C-alpha cells in the first residue's frame, strides 16, 4: 500500500501480463439496492468519469475502472486490523502517492466492529485543542480515541514514526464525552489521574469545521445545546476543558503554528522521519465520516486558515477536501455502543452485538504509477527551484490545464501536492476527486476564445488599487463560507468561492490557484510563519515581498494577472500560452519554422505531412470513449413524431409538384462560408489532401453550389437533412434536422416564385397550428379554427435598407455594422441593447434615434408599401425594392393570403448572401417576464447573390438563374408535435371509459361517450407505425411470440414483439399508450398451449380472448387506419350523404323533383346511378313509417341526372340508421318501442360482420376466402354505426375492375356509358351490368373493387 485516500486506499500493483506497475485506488462503499441511493453512487464515480475524458502528457493517465461486489461479515482479526500507517512513510518516501497516504478517514471498517467504546489518551503540545485536544499516539502503539454520543462519533487518530513519541503521553488516556451517560460511565475513572497533566496542556485556537466537512445529518439537531451544557458541567468537575461537537459542525484545529508551549512542542523538524500528522475523523449517526487532516485542507468557519506546514512528509490526502454533495457517502456505520480498537486487535468491552452480513461494493480505479515526488517536494527543497526550471514546469502545468479545461472540466483543488513529478522531471496533474464536469464557463472565457487577437492583446497586469481597499477574506463570518461551492484548499482557493459573490464559476478558479503555485515556485520561504504572512498579503492586497517585483518582473506580471480578484481579468490557459510571457520551448520554435515551410500545399513535404497525420492511430482510450457518439439518443415516440412530421410536410411539398433532392454532406471551404454569420460554429475538417471541408451549417449553401455545378435552370425541390454545429474538440458536432424548400427558375418568374414560397409557409403553419398553439390558453387552444392563431410572417426587402440608412444620416462605412447589429434583434437582443451597441460603434444618439424610428415600425404589408413609396421617392436605389414589394402585394392578394404578412424593416437575415426579399414566420409566445417573446419557425429569402458568388464564370452572371427558398426549424416543429401529443394523450386517458363505468362506451348513458370519441381520434392521429404489439406475461416465450408475429406479418399487418419480459399488464398497456400502439396481444404459457390469446384495444380498453387460428381474421376486420397513412377509404361530404339517405328514405316517391312517379325503383331524375356514402354526423331525415318494398334512387339537390361519384367511407358516431329490407333508414328518434325494434340487431363494434350476399367476377377461387374478409372489413367501416334488421341482406358485387372505372359507370334500363371505356374493360362491364339488372329489385348494391380495395354504393336501376 502506498497511500490512503478519503474513501479508500491506494496500492502499488504490478500487472502479471505486462509486468508494469500501476497505482490502483480501492474505494469501499455500501451495496445500495434502493433506487434513491443511486445518485450517491454517481457522485462517487465522478473521479472516474472525469479521468476517463483526459489523456494528456502532463495529466495523470487513467486506464480503467471496475466494481467488485462482496458480502462482508465480521472480518478476521488480520483483515480488520490492517495497519494503514505503520509502514506508511517508508512506502511514501518512494511513491508519489505519499501525499495522500497519511491524512485519511478512520481506519476502522464499518463492518468489522459493531461499535466503539471510549478510551482516553493524553495529548500535549501544539496538538491540544481547547484543552480537550486531539488524541495522538505513536507508531508503536497506534492507538485511537473515539469521542461520541448516541448519535455522533468523532475519531481522532494520528501516527508518529520516531522519537517524537516523547512529546506525547503514551500510557495515559482521556475521554471527551458528549453524552451524560457516556461521561458518567466511562470517563470518571480516568479523568482524575489526568487532571494535573491536563492543566499543563496549552490552549489552542479553536475553529469551526468548514461546510466542506459538514455531514448532512439533520437528526438531533435540536439537542445540541442540552448536550453541550451537560457535558461541560461534568468535564468541569473533572478539571478538564472539553469541546462539544454539535451535529459535527465544530472541529478542532491542530495546525495553528503556536509555538508558545513547552519545549516539547518541537515536532516540526527538518528531518523527514520526525514528521507528525494528526487527523480528525467524524461520523454522524448514519455512519458518514468526515476528516480534517492537513494544514491546507480545511477552511475554518472562523475565517482563518490552517497554514501549519508541519508535514514534511508532504502528506496531502488525495481526496481530503469534499464538496457538500459528497457528504452523503456512508463509509462507517457504528452502533450506539462503542469500543476502543487498539493495535493488538483486542476490544475493550466484553460484548458486542453482531451485525448481519452486508453486500459491499469496491470500486477499483487503475491509474498511471509515478514514482519520485510532487511539486511540493521540489518547492520545499533547500534552494528552491531554479528560474528556468520554474518556467518549464509552469508551462507544462498550463498545457495540462489547457487540456483539462478544453474538456470542460474544472480541477478545483490545484495545489503543489496534487502536481506530481515523474522520473523524467515532467509534470503530472492528478487528484481529480473535487473536479467537476460541465461546469459553467465564464462569459469572458467564451469571448476570449472567440476573439482572434485576444491572446496577443491580453492584459496580464492588474492594478492593486482595485483590491487594496477591499476587506480581507479572512474577516468573513461563518455564513459567508456555508456555500456549496466552498471547496478546495484555502490558500489556493479563489476569492469568488470564499466570498460567495458569484453563483457560477468557471475555469478561472484554477488560474487563481496557479498564481499562488507559481509564486511558491519563484520564492523560497524560510519559515512557515513567513509563508503564512506573505501569502496572506499576496492574496489580500497583491503585495509582493520586498525586491521581488524588481528582480523578477516577468514572474510578477504573470502572478499579478492570475491573482486578479476579478475572474474576467485573469487570463485563460490558452491566452497565457500565447501571451509570449512564457519562454517558448526550443522544439516549439523549430516546429513553427518548419510549419511555415511545409504548410505550402505546392511542395512535396506538404503531402508527406498529410500522409503522416492520417497515419496516426487513435489511442485505445479514445476508441473506447463515448466522445464521438455524444449526441443524445431519442425516444421511439420522438422518432415516430419526427417521421410523421416529415410525412405531413412532404405531402405539402408534393402537392406543389416538388421533388426531393439531397446535396452532398461535405463541401470545401470558400469565402462565402468564411463570411457566414455562423462561421465560428461551422464544423470544419481536413481531408487527406489537406483540403478544408465543412459540414453543412445550413442547407442553402450546398444547394446553391449544386445549382451552379450542375447548371440547373429550373427546379422545385425539398429536402430533409442534418445540419451541424461545432462542438468542443474531441466531441461529435451537434446534429440538427433542417428542412428546405427551394424554387429555381428564370429571373422573370421570380415574383411568382416568391408568392408560391410564401404560400408554402402559410400551408405549413396551418397544418401544424394545433401543435404549435395547442397548449396556449384561450381561443388558440383546440383545433385552431375557433380563434385567431397568433402567427405572423414578417417581410423585408434589402433593396430598401441602404436608402433608409442614408435617410437616417448613417455613413456608408457604418452600413455593415448596423446590419450585423440589427440582425440580432429578433432572437438575441432587444432594441435597447441594439441601440447601445450602435452607440458603442460610434453612431450618435440622434442617428440611432432616427434608425429606431424606421426599424421599430411594422404594419400591414400593403399599407406600409404605399407609405414607403412616398417616403423614399427621392432615393433611386429604393425603386427596385418598392417595385418588388408592390408586385408581391398584388400576387398575394390574388391567392388571398395577404392578411398574414407584415412589413418589418428591422428584419435582417443572412445579409451576406440574401438579396431582395427576405421573410420570417414566427409565433408569439408571451411570458410574464417577456410579454413580447417570439419564436422563429421558418425563415428564408431570395439568394440570387449567393448563386452569383459561387458561379465559376462571373462574365455569365447575368444569365444566372434566380432562387428563393425557405428553411424550417424541424426540431421545433417535431418537439411541438411531441409535446402536443403527450398533452392530448394525458387528457385522453384520464377521461376514457374504465371498468367502473356501468354503461359501455357506446351507450348514450355514458357521460364520457363524447370524450371517448374525441380521444379515439386523438389516439389514431398519433398512432405508431406498429399496429400490433405481441408480448408475454410470466414467461419469456420468445419463440412463440415470433410465431404469432410471423402470422401477422404474412397477412400484411404491421407487428412487433417484445424481447424483454413483462410482469404486469399495466406495464404493457402503458408502453403501448406511450408509443401509440393501438393493439396488444398477450401470450400466457398455459393459454397458448390450448391456442388462446388475449387481445386488448388500447384506445377503448376492451379485451377479448381470440383463438390463434382466428387472430389474422380478427385484425383484418378490426384494423384501425391512421389518418396520416394511406387510407383504404376516404371521407365524403355531409351533403352527398344527405342526398343519398334522403333519396333512399323517400318511400314511393321519385326523389327530390324527379319524374319517377310512383315507381318502386325510382332513380330521382330518370337515371339510375351510383353513389357513395361519406361521413356525416347530421342526417336527420323523416321516419320510415312502414316496411314496404319502397326504394330510392340516386337523388341530389341539383335535380340533375348526373351523379357525383363519391368515395365510400362513412362513420356515424351518434346516429341510429337502420339497414332493412327497404334500404337505409335514418331514424334519429329510434326507441325500443318502435315497430321495427324487435327486428333490429345493434352492433356495438365495427368488427361484427353484416349479413351479406357476395357475387365474385374475375376473382380466382383460391382468393375468395381472403377477399370475403376484406369485404366484411370494408362494409363494417362503410356502415359503421348502422343497425341491420334480421331480414335484411347487403348485396355485394366483387370485381377486379379499377375503382375509377366503377365510379364513372352509369347504367339505366334505357341507356349506359359502357361504350366510352376501353375494350379491355367492356366485357367485364357488361357482366357487371347483367348482375346489376338481376338485383335491380333491391334498393342499393355495393360494388367492391379488389384492385383498389374501395367500394361504391350503386342505387337501384329503373
Swiss-Prot record:
An example Gene Ontology molecular-function term: ATP binding
GO cellular component: cytoplasm; cytosol; nucleus
Gene knockout outcome: Subtle morphological defects such as an aberrant stalk structure; due to the redundancy between ifkA and ifkB functions. Cells lacking ifkA and ifkB display severe morphological and patterning defects. Mutant cells aggregate in streams that give tightly clumped mounds. Fingers form from the mounds but remain attached to one another, especially at their bases. The fingers culminate to give fused and entangled structures lacking proper stalk but containing some spores.
Biased composition (Polar residues): 136-148
Annotated residues for binding of ATP: 2-10, 25
Residue ranges, compositional bias (Gly residues): 1148-1172
SUPFAM superfamilies, alphabetized: Class II aaRS ABD-related, Class II aaRS and biotin synthetases, Protein kinase-like (PK-like)
Pfam families, per database record: HGTP_anticodon2, Pkinase, tRNA-synt_His
Compositionally biased region (Acidic residues): 306-333
GO biological process: cell-cell adhesion; cell-substrate adhesion; cellular response to amino acid starvation; DNA damage checkpoint signaling; negative regulation of translational initiation in response to stress; protein phosphorylation
Basic residues composition bias: residue spans: 197-208
Composition skew (Low complexity), residue ranges: 149-196, 258-285, 342-351, 447-466, 1185-1199
Region (Disordered), start-end ranges: 125-359, 445-470, 1148-1204
Entries under PROSITE patterns matching the protein: PROTEIN_KINASE_ATP (PS00107), PROTEIN_KINASE_DOM (PS50011), PROTEIN_KINASE_ST (PS00108)
Keyword vocabulary terms for this entry: ATP-binding, Kinase, Nucleotide-binding, Serine/threonine-protein kinase, Transferase
Catalysed conversion reaction: L-seryl-[protein] + ATP = O-phospho-L-seryl-[protein] + ADP + H(+); L-threonyl-[protein] + ATP = O-phospho-L-threonyl-[protein] + ADP + H(+)
Keyword Iron-sulfur (UniProt): no
Signal peptide: none
Uppermost EC category: transferase
Protein kinase domain residues: 1-582
Family stated for the protein in its record: Belongs to the protein kinase superfamily. Ser/Thr protein kinase family. GCN2 subfamily.
Protein name, per record: Probable serine/threonine-protein kinase ifkB
Species name: Dictyostelium discoideum
Source organism phylogeny: Eukaryota, Amoebozoa, Evosea, Eumycetozoa, Dictyostelia
